[in-house]
């Protein structure tokens, strides 16, 4: 396509050999300490050298970290923008860069992008993964000036992106909506053009397109990904107690499988309280199988396709209105029924309903209990919902971006 990417990143990841990849240590003392620990661990392991060097560096940097916190109060990542800006400025001035593309999660990438745009005038494209402004409740539009200095700076940075980026996009309708409310200059002349891009996902490894599902003696409900107290399987275990009281046979037939992350404390407590150690099975992270040679990702895909129903936990924080779990895009490729427990996100609900999914409202115990009962009854009849197969690939994201950035 005639595009030669030059990648800037932190030093903590693996260096990409396909194209120029510059890895920078952050210059601030707190971020330097963080990056240094990961760099030493990757290079020498976590043995004697790691312990000696990291403790020494921590002691030497301690007073400077305290000064940084008192003077600025930002999260440590901010200082990564300094080397990224300097290197980027040099590449731009020597004619090696035509467009800056800032991608974050980490807001320091956007900060470096804005600096480069303002100093050089280069075209800036920004992709915002997570909300920069965290709202507290449905009535909070995000106008209030945060007391926390890091949050206050992120508020300012969002306004900078909406003003100086040539194009800026978010991953959900909700995220774009609230950004536009706070930044009415968005999509106006001499400001950024903002829109929504659904990231999608490539088909998972070892995906079997015509997988014929086999019903077994157990109803297997499977969750993949991270868990936390605000995104917990305990809500399903609570519903299971009610289901077992109504259908005692369900106690021996239902199994809940958790892959990829440790259990959260609420789930652990619910297991102990209800004696569900044989019901909820924590498999942890699936790694490469030395016997079959299958990668961890391939094994995960197989487990997804073997599931009777895939569990999608959305969370309970207000920012769920601006967030769609990336795991959904992997789920959609498997062709298995999804049970989504969602929170204040009409776009996500519509996506699930269009594909014939089970749907519950986070925090609504009766809604969750009703969905679990329906799944149980459907499984007994071997009539689980047959999803409408509409996976979302990355090709549509590319088409969407091109439709916005190319001259009309």
Identify the residue ranges that each predicted region occupies.
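Nucleotide-sugar-dependent
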Residues: 231, 287-305, 310-329, 339-350
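Membrane-proximal helix-turn-helix segments that form the acceptor-binding/catalytic region
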Residues: 75, 82-90, 108-111, 115-119, ...
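A charged, aromatic-enriched C-terminal amphipathic alpha-helix characteristic of glycosyltransferases
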Residues: 362-370, 376-408
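Nucleotide-activated donor-binding/catalytic signature segment of Leloir-type glycosyltransferases, i.e.
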Residues: 247, 253, 257-261, 265-301
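Conserved donor-binding/catalytic core segment of Leloir-type glycosyltransferases
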Residues: 169, 204, 213-231, 237, ...
């Amino acid at each position: 396509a005639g595009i030669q990417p030059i990648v800037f990143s932190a030093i903590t990841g693996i260096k990409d050999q396909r194209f120029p990849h510059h890895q920078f240590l952050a210059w601030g003392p707190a971020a330097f300490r963080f990056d240094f620990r990961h760099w030493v661990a990757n290079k020498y392991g976590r043995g004697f050298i790691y312990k000696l060097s990291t403790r020494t560096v921590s002691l030497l940097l301690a007073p400077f970290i305290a000064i940084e916190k008192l003077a600025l109060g930002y999260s440590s990542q901010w200082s990564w923008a300094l080397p990224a800006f300097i290197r980027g400025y040099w590449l731009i001035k020597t004619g090696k860069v035509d467009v800056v593309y800032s991608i974050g999660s980490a807001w320091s990438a956007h900060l470096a992008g804005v600096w480069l745009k303002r100093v050089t005038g280069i075209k800036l494209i920004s992709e915002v993964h997570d909300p920069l402004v965290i709202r507290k409740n449905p009535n909070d539009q995000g106008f209030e000036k945060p007391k926390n200095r890091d949050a206050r700076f992120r508020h300012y940075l969002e306004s900078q992106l909406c003003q100086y980026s040539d194009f800026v996009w978010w991953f959900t309708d909700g995220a774009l909506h609230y950004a536009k409310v706070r930044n009415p200059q968005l999509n106006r002349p001499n400001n950024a053009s903002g829109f929504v891009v659904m990231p999608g996902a490539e088909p998972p490894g070892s995906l079997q397109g015509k997988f014929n599902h086999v019903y077994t003696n157990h109803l297997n409900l499977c969750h993949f990904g991270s868990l936390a107290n605000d995104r917990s399987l305990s809500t399903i275990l609570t519903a299971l107690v009610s289901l077992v009281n109504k259908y005692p046979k369900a106690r021996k037939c239902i199994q809940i499988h958790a892959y990829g992350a440790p259990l959260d404390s609420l789930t652990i407590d619910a297991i102990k309280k209800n004696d569900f150690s044989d019901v909820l099975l924590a498999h942890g992270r699936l790694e490469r199988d030395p016997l079959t040679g299958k990668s961890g990702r391939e094994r995960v895909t197989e487990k997804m396709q073997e599931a009777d129903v895939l569990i999608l936990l959305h969370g309970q924080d207000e920012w769920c209105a601006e967030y769609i779990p990336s795991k959904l895009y992997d789920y959609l490729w498997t062709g298995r029924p999804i049970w989504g427990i969602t929170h204040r996100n009409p776009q996500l609900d519509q996506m699930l309903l269009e594909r014939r999914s089970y749907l519950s409202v986070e925090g609504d115990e009766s809604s969750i209990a009703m969905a679990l009962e329906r799944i149980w009854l459907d499984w007994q009849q071997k009539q689980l919902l047959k999803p409408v197969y509409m996976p979302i690939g990355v090709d549509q994201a590319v088409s969407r971006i091109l439709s916005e950035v190319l001259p009309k």
